[in-house]
Amino acid sequence: MQTKGLILFDIDGVIRDVTNSYRLSVQKTVLKYCNWEPSTYDIDVLKNEGIWNNDWDLTLELIKRFINKNKLSLEPPSRDNIIKNFEKLYFGCHPNESHMKWSGFINNEKLLVDTKFFDFLNLNKIRWGFVSGAELPSAKFILENRLRLNNPPLIAMNDAPDKPNPEGFLKLANKLLEKDFGPNCPPVAYVGDTIADIQTIINAKELYPSQRFISIGVIPPHLKTAENFQKQSQYESKLKAAGADLIIKSVIDLKNIHKELFKA
């Protein structure tokens, strides 16, 4: 089968809604250690700096900044303690336990796409895969158990350096296309909801300027409410300013623009 192009997807905020799971784990972990619960806007502000792709590091940074801003005589927790508390909230137990035992916030996650979407991509000769900073058990659970995808191509946490380092993205793209990057290689798109995702593609373009890479920003679910309309518009502007080639409201929108996306 001749490949028209390749689309790699982030998972959190793109494939699943993590408003009441990962983001809630961030909020409740910060609350535990400094008696302040950040809003989703506070989290977005930090993520928009483009370097806080790891939610554990983001959580610790929120705590440190709050302590410093308010001149509190508190000692920030260790990163290990952040991780332990975070995973207790998110999984409800150790992540290596059977997912049947998971009782945490992960059970709150809603899918933003269905299996038929990937059947559509296959039918249209578009290859696909996932590059995410999520832990492997969590990523595999959403892709294999919830979406019922068979052995989906995946780069997860610890498989490669954190975004915006493009190593994981380039590694999976090269593996799936089985070609050297360049003008004769099919276009490669990446769909993500943060500035770090956009910056990942900018960094990839710098390494392989003759390869066509496309950065696609998607609006995260927590902003898709009437009361957040202005914030949604501001967020979209930030993604564009960061260098996004295209902004979409939902991954499903790709079904309507896939032909234009990979047009020579």
Where do the PLM segments sit?
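Non-catalytic pre-domain segments flanking phosphatase-related domains
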Residues: M1-F9, E61, N68-K84, K88, ...
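Active-site neighborhood of HAD-like aspartate-dependent phosphohydrolases
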Residues: M1-V45, I51, D57
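Short, acidic loop-to-helix structural element flanking the phosphoryl-transfer center
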Residues: T3, L8, F91-F130, A134-E144
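Helix-loop "lid/cap" segments that line or gate small-molecule binding pockets
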Residues: Q27-Y33, W56-L72, L172
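Short, surface-exposed acidic
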Residues: C34-N48, N68-F86, C93-H94, L149-P152, ...
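Structural recognition of alpha->loop->beta junctions
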Residues: K125, L147-N158, A226-H258
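Substrate-recognition "cap/lid" segment bordering the active-site pocket of phosphatases
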Residues: G129, A134-A189, T194-F213
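Acidic, Mg2+-coordinating phosphoryl-transfer loop and its flanking beta/alpha structural elements
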Residues: Y190-K249
